[in-house]
Regions:
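Extracytoplasmic/lumenal domain signature
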Residues: 1-178
């Protein structure tokens, strides 16, 4: 039983791996961990909207293993919010979520924009002088002045709080580089 959706499920991003586990998200908003030896799901969480990026994986000095990922609006129509998340890779528990600054709009049918809103590519896990940051490129964000562009957000890895942001002059669907 359940509802039939009017789109096909697919995996747009790539797979991250740690040990025997593979992590990936799909167009329906399900992020899951699969044991590559048994091909059985270890955990799965519903993020409420499409995942089009490859999750970024980081192992921390304390032994924790974490995924950083985000969603894109419009494919499922179940959510009106772009989500940026840190997830415990071993349990599937959400460590933090940042939504406050992002007001994205879905505009794929808009001939001028021709673009999804949200996280379209993997975030950058900061190293060296920026090892406390995770950096997301979020496409098609509506700013306070109602203009729409991509925005690069740097978040504190520990808390998910925004450290800085930089609006871009155009849409952008690429991973940030450091």
């Amino acid at each position: 039983t359940g509802s039939v959706r009017d789109f096909k499920q697919g995996i747009t991003g790539g797979v991250a791996s740690y040990g025997d586990y593979a992590y990936y998200g799909d167009d329906t908003g399900i992020l899951q961990c699969v044991d590559m030896n048994t091909m059985q799901a270890v955990w799965a969480i519903d993020l409420g909207e499409s995942m089009m990026c490859t999750p970024a994986l980081e192992t921390e000095e304390d032994g924790g293993v974490y995924l950083y990922t985000g969603t894109a609006l419009g494919k499922t129509g179940r959510s009106a919010q772009i989500r940026l998340l840190k997830i415990d890779a071993l349990t599937g528990d959400i460590v933090w979520e940042c939504q406050s600054a992002i007001k994205g709009k879905y505009a794929s049918k808009d001939a001028k924009a021709g673009s999804y809103a949200g996280v379209m590519a993997s975030p950058l896990v900061g190293e060296g002088e920026i090892n406390d940051l995770i950096i997301f490129n979020v496409n098609h964000v509506e700013l306070d002045d109602k203009s729409i562009c991509a925005v690069v957000y740097a978040l504190d890895k520990a808390t998910g709080e925004e450290v800085w942001n930089q609006p871009l002059d155009v849409d952008s669907k690429s991973s940030p580089i450091g």
